[in-house]
């Protein structure tokens, strides 16, 4: 069994490995609240476009 066949062969149907950012594909720093599913870096970039307003 070659390395290419073994790498990422385990099914990721649940947990942190199964979710990724809708914009960048990153798996770290994911905001799932309200069904956003975007990374926090992408959220800072697209927050105004989505409709979030900064009050302070």
From Swiss-Prot:
Keyword Amino-acid biosynthesis listed: no
UniProt entry keywords in alphabetical sequence: Cytoplasm, Nucleus, Ribonucleoprotein, Ribosomal protein
GO MF term set: structural constituent of ribosome; zinc ion binding
Transport recorded as keyword: no
GO biological processes: cytoplasmic translation
InterPro entries (alphabetical): Ribosomal_uS14, RIbosomal_uS14_euk_arc, Ribosomal_uS14_sf
Highest taxon listed in the record's lineage: Eukaryota
Quaternary context: Component of the small ribosomal subunit (SSU). Mature yeast ribosomes consist of a small (40S) and a large (60S) subunit. The 40S small subunit contains 1 molecule of ribosomal RNA (18S rRNA) and at least 33 different proteins. The large 60S subunit contains 3 rRNA molecules (25S, 5.8S and 5S rRNA) and at least 46 different proteins.
Functional note: Component of the ribosome, a large ribonucleoprotein complex responsible for the synthesis of proteins in the cell. The small ribosomal subunit (SSU) binds messenger RNAs (mRNAs) and translates the encoded message by selecting cognate aminoacyl-transfer RNA (tRNA) molecules. The large subunit (LSU) contains the ribosomal catalytic site termed the peptidyl transferase center (PTC), which catalyzes the formation of peptide bonds, thereby polymerizing the amino acids delivered by tRNAs into a polypeptide chain.
Family: Belongs to the universal ribosomal protein uS14 family.
Protein name: Small ribosomal subunit protein uS14
């Amino acid at each position: 069994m070659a390395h290419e066949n073994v790498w990422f062969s385990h099914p990721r149907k649940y947990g942190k490995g199964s979710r990724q950012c809708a914009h960048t594909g990153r798996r770290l720093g994911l905001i799932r609240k309200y069904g956003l599913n975007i990374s926090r870096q992408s959220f800072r970039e697209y927050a105004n476009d989505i409709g979030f307003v900064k009050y302070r």
